[in-house]
């Protein structure tokens, strides 16, 4: 082939190459087995991370719900002492409402002062508890539960839950009095500590009452004491009268008997022949 023809062909092929740009064909690279395994591990770790995050969120919500439920239950649950205090407060309010019509002005002031003092003490106890209170002066709340089985302390009876110990009307108070008096006074004369018991019992019963009411009770006790003294004096006088009559009759009988053992008596001369 002539040299010129070769040059023409080269020039034409060069021009054609310049006119048509080369298209890059992407050939997918084949992955190796270890690369595919790494990719699957990464996906599994992502899924596990998402699952653990969901589990943590669920556990957190469950813990919050449980804590909230426990807090509500604790707030709603009342202790035995709280129930007793509420019971006493309701009974006290009922008593005050019943006695409000009969009380005098001084009694009303005394009741209001006592109620305010008790409220202040309760508020201070809620704020400070037992801080600053010596152990010897700590006042223990009286328990109204009574054990019915000495061998089992858990078997108790709550007296404040019984209707008879929660009187509100005059009739209910009379029923409680009639139920308590036979129990307290049964065989009282044979109990050596009964007098001390009654002194302290009456004092504690009247401790929260107004002074005017205590004076009325004291007057009735004084009248009862005077009546008992009269009865005791009358009984003692009857015994003395019986003893005196018995002694007089014995002396009179002895005076009419001649004493044959006495030789000091002198007889008149007229007694002889």
Curated annotation (Swiss-Prot):
UniProt keyword terms in alphabetical order: Coiled coil, Cytoplasm, Initiation factor, Protein biosynthesis
Oligomeric form and interacting partners: Component of the eukaryotic translation initiation factor 3 (eIF-3) complex.
Organism, as annotated: Pyricularia oryzae (strain 70-15 / ATCC MYA-4617 / FGSC 8958) (Rice blast fungus)
Coiled coil: 50-97
Protein origin, superkingdom: Eukaryota
GO BP terms, alphabetized: formation of cytoplasmic translation initiation complex
Keyword Ubl conjugation appears in the UniProt entry: no
Region named Disordered: 1-158
The keyword Coiled coil belongs to this UniProt entry's keyword annotation: yes
InterPro entries, per the entry: eIF3-like_dom_sf, eIF3j
Family, as annotated: Belongs to the eIF-3 subunit J family.
Location within or outside the cell: Cytoplasm
Encoding gene (name): HCR1
Compositionally skewed regions (Basic and acidic residues) per UniProt: 55-75, 105-126
Gene Ontology CC annotation, any one: eukaryotic 43S preinitiation complex
One MF annotation (Gene Ontology) recorded for this entry: translation initiation factor activity
Bias (Acidic residues): 34-54, 95-104
Protein name: Eukaryotic translation initiation factor 3 subunit J
Role summary: Component of the eukaryotic translation initiation factor 3 (eIF-3) complex, which is involved in protein synthesis of a specialized repertoire of mRNAs and, together with other initiation factors, stimulates binding of mRNA and methionyl-tRNAi to the 40S ribosome. The eIF-3 complex specifically targets and initiates translation of a subset of mRNAs involved in cell proliferation.
Cross-referenced Pfam families: eIF3_subunit (PF08597)
């Amino acid at each position: 082939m002539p040299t010129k023809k070769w040059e023409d062909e080269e020039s034409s092929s060069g021009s054609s190459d310049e006119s048509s740009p080369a298209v890059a064909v992407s050939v997918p690279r084949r992955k190796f087995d270890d690369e595919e395994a790494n990719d699957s591990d990464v996906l599994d770790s992502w899924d596990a991370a998402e699952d653990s995050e969901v589990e943590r969120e669920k556990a957190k919500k469950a813990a919050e719900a449980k804590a909230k439920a426990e807090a509500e239950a604790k707030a709603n649950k009342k202790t035995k002492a709280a129930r007793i205090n509420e019971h006493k407060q309701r009974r006290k309010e009922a008593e005050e409402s019943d006695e409000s019509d009969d009380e005098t002005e001084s009694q009303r002031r005394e009741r209001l002062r006592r109620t305010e003092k008790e409220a202040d003490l309760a508020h201070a106890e809620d704020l400070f508890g037992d801080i600053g209170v010596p152990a010897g002066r700590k006042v223990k709340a009286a328990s109204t539960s009574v054990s019915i089985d000495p061998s089992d302390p858990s078997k108790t009876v709550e007296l404040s839950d019984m209707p008879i110990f929660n009187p509100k009307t005059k009739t209910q108070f009379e029923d409680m009095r009639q139920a308590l008096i036979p129990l307290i006074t049964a065989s009282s004369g044979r109990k050596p500590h009964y007098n001390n018991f009654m002194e302290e019992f009456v004092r504690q019963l009247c401790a929260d009452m107004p002074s005017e009411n205590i004076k009325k009770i004291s007057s009735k006790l004084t009248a009862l004491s005077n009546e008992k003294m009269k009865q005791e004096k009358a009984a003692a006088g009857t015994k003395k009268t019986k003893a005196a009559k018995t002694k007089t009759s014995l002396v009179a009988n002895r005076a009419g008997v001649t004493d044959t053992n006495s030789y000091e008596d002198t007889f008149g001369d007229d007694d002889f022949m």
